[in-house]
Amino acid sequence: MIQNVGNHLRRGFASMFSNRTSRKSISHPESGDPPTMAEGEGYRNPTEVQMSQLVLPCHTNHRGELSIGQLLKWIDTTACLSAERHAGCPCVTASMDDIYFDHTISVGQVVNIKAKVNRAFNSSMEVGIQVVSEDLCSEKQWSVCKALATFVAHRELSKVKLKQVIPLTEEEKTEHGVAAERRRMRLVYADTIKDLLTHCVIQDDLDKDCSNMVPAEKTRVESVELVLPPHANHQGNTFGGQIMAWMENVATIAASRLCHAHPTLKAIEMFHFRGPSQVGDRLVLKAIVNNAFKHSMEVGVCVEAYRQEAETQRRHINSAFMTFVVLDKDDQPQKLPWIRPQPGEGERRYREASARKKIRLDRKYLVSCKQAEVALSVPWDPSNQVYLSYYNVSSLKTLMAKDNWVLSVEISEVRLYILEEDFLSFHLEMVVNVDAAQVFQLLSDLRRRPEWDKHYRSVELVQQVDEDDAIYHVISPALSGNTKPQDFVILASRRKPCDNGDPYVIALRSVTLPTHHETPEYQRGETLCSGFCLWREGDQMTKVSYYNQATPGFLNYVTTNVSGLSSEFYNTFKACESFLLDNRNDLAPSLQTL
């Protein structure tokens, strides 16, 4: 249906306006003049590093498959070299985001690892890694995993200020834009776990029959490693990948003690390096099964370091959580025994493992799946608010980064672009004589939108989630052909620029709340992705860009109003400009933090 609507719109616009031009320059590079060749044959990201390794028997586990520990060492090395190529100085691993392993790699196959810097901040940078396995005989290739790592540049005598990454391709622009939101998500991860345990009821099953349960203490593992020169990089610091490999080893032993079989690692929760380790350090690795679910188990691993045996104070180096399964001969997960945690700290870890499992499921659904697979309205609750906000902002930035927008019409310096891919999307653009911070403050409060947008009859603030996220209940007039007015429950996520050249962002998407069910009085509407991106255009000038990814409910309105679509959008946007000009002087006290 969407494709037919797209064809209808294309013919309608073509008959109304001629000489449509492709939008060639919608991006806003951060600094410098980018090379003329952005895509096509021969282009390669200047920070890209590739590694190819033939899997030998010495790299494998009992199943003849590549050891995940060995893979982590290769991943870390490749990513570090990419980071150092951009930084021009030594770099150390700060963290590694969640990794989901989709396929195993067998002896004789080739591992192809590709890493590139997505974005640089002040002294840290996000590196994206892609791992593909290759069968040389059949010439088939499989995606094994994707990973995101954070590296910190380090110089002995001076403070590092990294140069900015200038994205050129559509993929690079998307990753660059979303990297800031991912960084925000990493910083609040610990608080997310605490909030979930505080405000949500976690089913812990601690009262069930203990007779057939395995005591968690039976799975406890402790192992020590002496850091030798081969374990360290060219700076004398222990390889992050080597530490991760040691952690995977003790975690596998702990998992095996629960299931009395050979487990398979399926996912790794975020690695976060809290401090460095050098040659000569003794690393103490501790692992224990925190919780066992029906077909999977979570193992917690902790790494501490000390220099001399006489030292009483150990340094906390790293912690991580790993998810294991036990596969049968058909590669299907087997049922696992229940685990009985120790009172006190053991029960705390048990409940936190349940909370992390819920977060993983929410995150995997919201972040990992394709946009077309996500429901228009996703249930909102404290356990997934961080990832809903992330998906809200990243969806808008992904739409913004598209490079095949087509200019449909321009009326008095208001431009309307359309994009026909999986969804039909619209983009309006104008420049206003108002400072970007003022525009951001005025447009981010949806309660003021009825002052200029006739499609918003009333707006109620339902919940102020945090300083930058809020949920609103919106009432809109009835669309043509309908007798009922529409209502929406909308999550609004606003973001200030992370760096020079970044836009202010106001992202909107529908959510569902238990306090605001559908009612007979209104027809429930939904929006998948819409919002504003605001760029500074010189002194007191702002480029205002509005994006909307049309949903099925909106498509009917579009198809029945093709002839008046452009003029109505123009009138609404000009009303927005008048609203901004009339109210720009009312915000001086509130702009201090922007």
From Swiss-Prot:
GO terms for biological process: fatty acid metabolic process; intracellular signal transduction; negative regulation of cold-induced thermogenesis; response to cold; response to temperature stimulus. SMART domains: START (SM00234). Residues 1-20 form a transit peptide. PROSITE patterns: HOTDOG_ACOT (PS51770), START (PS50848). InterPro entries: Cytosol_ACT, HOTDOG_ACOT, HotDog_dom_sf, START-like_dom_sf, START_lipid-bd_dom, Thioestr_dom. It comes from the Eukaryota. Coiled coil: none annotated. Gene3D superfamilies: 3.30.530.20, Hotdog Thioesterase. GO terms for molecular function: carboxylic ester hydrolase activity; fatty acyl-CoA hydrolase activity; lipid binding; long-chain fatty acyl-CoA hydrolase activity. Transmembrane segments: none annotated. Residues 20-43 are annotated as: Disordered. Pfam families: 4HBT, START. It catalyses: hexadecanoyl-CoA + H2O = hexadecanoate + CoA + H(+); tetradecanoyl-CoA + H2O = tetradecanoate + CoA + H(+); dodecanoyl-CoA + H2O = dodecanoate + CoA + H(+); butanoyl-CoA + H2O = butanoate + CoA + H(+). The keyword Hydrolase applies. GO terms for cellular component: cytoplasm; cytosol; mitochondrial matrix. Keywords: Cytoplasm, Fatty acid metabolism, Hydrolase, Lipid metabolism, Mitochondrion, Phosphoprotein, Repeat, Serine esterase, Transit peptide. Its EC number is 3.1.2.-, 3.1.2.2. Residues 370-582 form the START domain. Has an acyl-CoA thioesterase activity with a preference for the long chain fatty acyl-CoA thioesters hexadecanoyl-CoA/palmitoyl-CoA and tetradecanoyl-CoA/myristoyl-CoA which are the main substrates in the mitochondrial beta-oxidation pathway. This is Acyl-coenzyme A thioesterase 11.
